[in-house]
Amino acid sequence: HCISSAASDVYKRQHAVGDEKWYEKISVRYTGRVKNSIKTKDNLLFKKNLIRDWENGMQHEIPVSATFTLFKYFNVTPTVNYTERWYTRKVKKDWDDEQGKEVNDTTYGFHRVYDYSASLGINTKVYGMYKPLFMKKKEIQIRHVITPSISFSAAPDFTSSRFGYYDSYIKDQNGIRDTVQYSYYAGQVFSPPSGGKQGLISFNISNNLEMKFKDKNDSIRKVSLIDDLSMGISYNTAAQVRPWSDLSFNLRLKLSKSYTLSMSSTFATYAYEFDENGRVVPGNRTEWSYGRFGRWSGYGTSFSWTVNNDSWKKIRNFFTG
């Protein structure tokens, strides 16, 4: 079951007078989800205990965001996300040396688990207009739009003991001792908060290229040359090793009103090295430190076709004559 409530612009005045206030730009949304399921035989369905036998829970998501203009040219978007989960069971795990296996101790009741994160995005647009070197006599103009952006996002480490969502035990098997970390709420209808402190700085720059010209009837036409050409990379300030992400490139071409070609490519930031066992593994030195751009590690392409009313008419006429 899903309960969704969109409460955008909750602070806007119904009868505004004068300029818009800063707090009127704040948007608040709420989404609630309830899950309740069980796997059993038909004749045993109503004999099961709602708390012990059913898989159930509830999740609340509340994003709060706003968009402001800074110095007339910069768009600033702060966002705070809050998620809360309600569980009906808590599972504590341990290692039983005699049985040589993991054992569970389940506590039933109401268990509230939450997590939160915050982010801040800043972007602007730079416009350029120029005439191509070829066909100078024709009225052709190229518009280039560059959109640089930077964003900051942060979240605490929810595996920390101060939150009480995670625990660990010592696994002693075949003379090998390992520390196993786990969440009390893993495997339930809603996933628990993920681990690891986050402090991400993301950089992105996108380009759009459009040509404007006059046709034979002196009508102005616009043609998309490059719908989007972008590159992005991020830096995790909380990472102890290898804080840089891979460098990604994306290209989208609108071949017509209905056809779109998309391509993407990824370049690994860190160079390979040999570990103590002679295996090739990603190292801690960047490709840049060796004077290389990056290590190509993947490529993808997709082709999409958008069907509109005109397209449906053409298809129908093709089959019906």
What are these regions (language model features)?
Residues 5-321:
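Outer-membrane beta-barrel proteins and related beta-barrel translocases across Gram-negative bacteria
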